[in-house]
């Protein structure tokens, strides 16, 4: 089956709320994470910033997994700027430069209609090619909070994951409660109005992936963790046939006791795949800590691994390639 890997980049002001996102060394640096992730897939290191994105504790971006899988399986990557502060310095499709707003103060995405329309056009063009399957990953700091807000607005009793082992669930819930109060809604009130949930609480990545999936009528693999549950819930509410969709994530998301990944996927009615990578024997603490609940998923890591496995590589080979790439990065650091 001919597949293409699409990386959708998104930013939301929610990532600037202290304590919400560890998808960057500081809240301010989360603005650079999406373009830097995209660049790292094409270069030895990002160009927009002189290092790969890390958590505040220094754990490497999951883009390293996506890059490893691609080095093995050689699948094509298309970068799509759904809505970011900065454009990546790689060839990409521009959908919008709209950044999701802080939904505690105002609706998150007044531009959602235009973003969905533009992304749908791209999906329709891809549908005209011989490509039979889109594997869509994302890089969106703060996106698990917008995802949980959208899921709650639509009546799902979901808890999303986090790139930190200490999921800031109570902070997320406080932020969401303030957003619901501002919008004048209660949980579940928008279950029949998915686009209003997207407008009030979503982010440009979600709108872009929804549009792509509406335009491309063949198989779609949503390569992500709990953020892709929100996308799935939106697609289901838009009466899409869920049998052509699958979520591909990592075992670290599935194992996350602070989240409800499997339960919510079942409630939505979408099948899931979890990449069985193992970094426990890595020589690098930054990678070993993935086994302790750091990072977990992002940049389509689970979906990219799934593509490598479909191409005949084993999870062990992907893990070994990640190790090799991380060693190369460490070697580039000045002593």
Curated annotation (Swiss-Prot):
SUPFAM superfamilies: Nicotinate mononucleotide:5,6-dimethylbenzimidazole phosphoribosyltransferase (CobT) (SSF52733)
Top-level taxonomic group: Archaea
TM ranges: none
Coiled-coil annotated spans: none
Molecular functions (GO terms): nicotinate-nucleotide-dimethylbenzimidazole phosphoribosyltransferase activity
Short name of one Pfam family: DBI_PRT
Record family assignment: Belongs to the UPF0284 family.
Protein's UniProt name: UPF0284 protein TK0853
Species of the source: Thermococcus kodakarensis (strain ATCC BAA-918 / JCM 12380 / KOD1) (Pyrococcus kodakaraensis (strain KOD1))
């Amino acid at each position: 089956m001919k597949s293409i890997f699409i990386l959708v980049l998104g930013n939301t002001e929610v990532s600037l709320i202290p304590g919400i996102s560890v998808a960057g060394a500081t809240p301010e640096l989360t603005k650079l994470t999406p373009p830097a992730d995209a660049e790292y897939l094409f270069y030895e290191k990002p160009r927009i910033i002189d290092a790969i994105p890390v958590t505040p504790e220094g754990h490497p971006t999951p883009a390293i997994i996506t890059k490893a899988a691609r080095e093995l399986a050689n699948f094509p990557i298309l970068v799509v700027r759904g809505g970011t502060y900065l454009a990546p310095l790689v060839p990409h499709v521009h959908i919008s430069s709209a950044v999701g707003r802080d939904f505690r103060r105002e609706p998150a995405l007044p531009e959602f209609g235009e973003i969905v329309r533009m992304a749908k056009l791209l999906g329709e063009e891809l549908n005209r090619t011989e490509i039979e399957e889109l594997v869509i990953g994302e890089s969106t700091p703060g996106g698990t909070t917008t995802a949980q807000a959208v899921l709650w607005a639509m009546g799902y009793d979901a808890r999303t994951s986090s790139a930190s082992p200490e999921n800031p669930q109570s902070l997320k819930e406080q932020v969401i409660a303030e957003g619901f109060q501002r919008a004048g809604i209660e949980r579940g009130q928008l279950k029949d109005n998915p686009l209003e949930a997207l407008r009030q609480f979503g982010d440009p990545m979600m709108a872009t992936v929804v549009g792509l999936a509406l335009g491309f009528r063949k198989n779609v693999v949503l390569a992500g963790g709990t953020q892709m549950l929100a996308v799935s819930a939106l697609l289901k509410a838009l009466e899409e046939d869920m049998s052509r969709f699958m979520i591909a994530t990592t075992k670290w998301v599935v194992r996350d006791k602070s989240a409800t990944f499997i339960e919510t996927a079942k409630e939505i009615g979408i099948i899931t795949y979890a990449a069985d990578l193992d970094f426990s024997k890595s020589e690098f603490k930054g990678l070993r800590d993935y086994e302790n609940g750091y990072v977990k998923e992002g940049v389509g890591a689970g979906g990219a691994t799934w593509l490598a496995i479909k191409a005949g590589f084993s999870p062990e080979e992907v893990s070994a390639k990640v190790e090799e790439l991380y060693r190369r990065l460490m070697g580039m650091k000045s002593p």
